[in-house]
């Protein structure tokens, strides 16, 4: 919720329209187009709620800004990660589509984000991210009862070229497609 006012400053005539629990919503315009900024909380369930409720209000394009933990050594602190897909190692997306359905972003939005990063001169990476439910589990797996499985999967994600670990993209992509 704390990022919303900072992002809303980039809008013309921003105004806060709602604040309830983890959902802080601002609306304004950007280059003449209506734009809203909404926090989604942490994880898939709260992201799915935000996407469903905003879609019911007529929102048709979603861009999530957040943090992630690097898996690839190529990703440095402060780099921009643009997800081309998400490993669905979480539960929310399974409520919307079979696990075989890929969690991928809309191609037009993906290419717009890549072009924006290029034009702004950002250091950015495109690729698959791992989406999970546990904030700490993959980052200190040795203390978890399933440490062997977590370590095995972490190594698999690294070998497969997964860029980063986060908690919302699979829900965003899958709910957005449903």
Question: Residues of each region from the PLM?
Answer:
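Generic secondary-structure signature for well-ordered alpha-helical cores
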Residues: 9-16, 85, 114-123, 134, ...
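Metabolite-binding pocket within alpha/beta catalytic cores that recognizes anionic/polar moieties
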Residues: 1-112
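Short secondary-structure transition/capping segments
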Residues: 74-77, 137-139, 177
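A C-terminal functional module that forms or caps the active site or interfaces directly
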Residues: 153-178
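Active-site rim beta-loop-alpha module in soluble metabolic enzymes
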Residues: 103-161
């Amino acid at each position: 919720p704390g990022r919303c006012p900072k992002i809303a400053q980039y809008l013309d005539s921003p105004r806060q329209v709602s604040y309830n629990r983890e959902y802080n919503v601002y609306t304004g315009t950007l280059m003449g187009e209506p734009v809203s900024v909404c926090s989604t909380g942490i994880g898939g369930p709260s992201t799915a709620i935000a996407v469903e409720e905003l879609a019911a209000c007529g929102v048709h394009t979603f861009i999530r800004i957040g943090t992630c933990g690097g898996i690839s050594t190529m990703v440095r602190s402060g780099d921009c990660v643009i997800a081309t897909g998400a490993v669905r190692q979480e539960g929310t997306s399974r409520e919307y589509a079979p696990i075989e359905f890929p969690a991928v972003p809309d191609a037009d939005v993906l290419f717009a984000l890549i072009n924006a990063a290029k034009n702004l001169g950002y250091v950015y990476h495109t690729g698959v991210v791992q989406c999970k439910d546990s904030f700490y589990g993959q980052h200190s797996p040795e203390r978890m009862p399933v440490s062997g499985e977590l370590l095995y999967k972490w190594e698999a994600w690294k070998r497969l070229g997964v860029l980063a670990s986060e908690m919302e993209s699979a829900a965003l992509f899958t709910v957005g497609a449903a």
